[in-house]
């Protein structure tokens, strides 16, 4: 057998995902899944700050991509097997699970087919809603194609009892289908909900600068460092593999919810 670095999602079904993880465990081999946001310093900080906002959390995220030419062709190829909320959603659902540290219990979804160039039954816009055991809720929206709007296409925002934190992402003029821009964080804004005796805000908003961050290739290099370290130092990847299965379970439940029009209990 061989140690494996596997791009996300880990499989096209939960059963296949479990089979892959069980195989890695049985043969004592390392399996790292390409959750690139887990090695992104700005996103790691975003998760850390969100965990200090109290419970429950409200998590609002999206990544819509207005694509054309080769990028639209790539999107159509990806949609031969899975919708945008499945392909991209695993990243952001994984982030939500890290923020809440709670068990997801319910998933619902809406979606729309906005192009006749897609296979029958496929849709290129979707939005999932997930509820957690601790009362946290989150939504993730993803749409691909030449028709997609670039208004409010990069929302990364978390609200808790103690305040809210958000990522200020792409600059004006950047293309939404630019892979380098998808994980970019220009800065993180932290707002405190605490009020003083006059009923006014007790603290000013904080801006955490994220300008000095790796590009997409740099993040891919970090992923390979994680993989190499796991092999050379025999790192236990149990949680990493279980998280990959769980995030896939949520987005596939969202896909089912859209197709059936019913909320799915996990």
Functional labels for PLM-detected ranges:
Residues 1-2, 72-80, 203-209:
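Short glycine/proline- and charge-enriched loop/turn segments
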Residues 93-180, 221-234:
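Contiguous beta-strand/loop segments that form the cofactor/metal-binding neighborhood of enzyme cores
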Residues 153-154, 163, 167-217:
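Glycine-enriched catalytic-core subsegment of oxygenase/oxidase enzymes
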Residues 37-120, 126, 261:
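Predominantly a Rossmann-like dinucleotide-binding segment in NAD(P)-dependent oxidoreductases
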Residues 16, 21, 26, 177, ...:
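C-terminal helix-rich "cap/oligomerization" subdomain common to oxidoreductases
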Residues 80-86, 149, 210-218:
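A short glycine-threonine-serine/GTX helix/turn-capping micro-motif
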Residues 1-38:
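Beta-strand-loop-alpha-helix segment that lines the small-molecule cofactor/substrate pocket
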């Amino acid at each position: 057998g061989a140690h494996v670095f596997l791009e996300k999602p880990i499989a096209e079904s939960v059963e296949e995902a479990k089979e892959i993880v069980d195989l890695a465990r049985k043969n004592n081999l390392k399996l790292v899944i390409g959750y690139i946001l887990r090695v992104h310093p700005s996103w790691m900080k975003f998760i850390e700050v969100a965990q200090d906002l109290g419970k429950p959390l409200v998590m609002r995220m999206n990544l819509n991509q207005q694509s054309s030419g080769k990028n639209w062709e790539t999107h159509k190829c990806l949609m031969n097997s899975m919708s945008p909320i499945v392909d991209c959603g695993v990243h952001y659902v994984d982030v939500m699970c890290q923020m809440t540290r709670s068990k997801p219990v319910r998933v619902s979804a809406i979606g729309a087919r906005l192009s006749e160039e897609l296979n029958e039954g496929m849709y290129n816009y979707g939005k999932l809603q997930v509820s957690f055991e601790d009362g946290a809720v989150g939504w993730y929206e993803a749409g691909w194609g030449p028709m997609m709007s670039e208004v409010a296409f990069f929302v990364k925002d978390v609200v808790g009892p103690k305040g809210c934190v958000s990522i200020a992402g792409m600059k004006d003029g950047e293309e939404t289908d630019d892979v380098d821009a998808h994980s970019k964080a220009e800065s993180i804004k932290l707002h405190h909900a605490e009020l003083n005796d006059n009923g006014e805000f007790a603290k000013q908003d904080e801006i955490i600068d994220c300008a000095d961050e790796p590009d997409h290739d740099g993040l891919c290099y970090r992923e390979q460092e994680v993989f190499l370290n796991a092999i050379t130092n025999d790192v236990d990847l149990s949680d990493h593999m279980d998280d990959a299965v769980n995030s896939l379970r949520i987005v596939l439940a969202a896909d089912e919810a859209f197709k059936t029009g019913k909320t799915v209990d996990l």
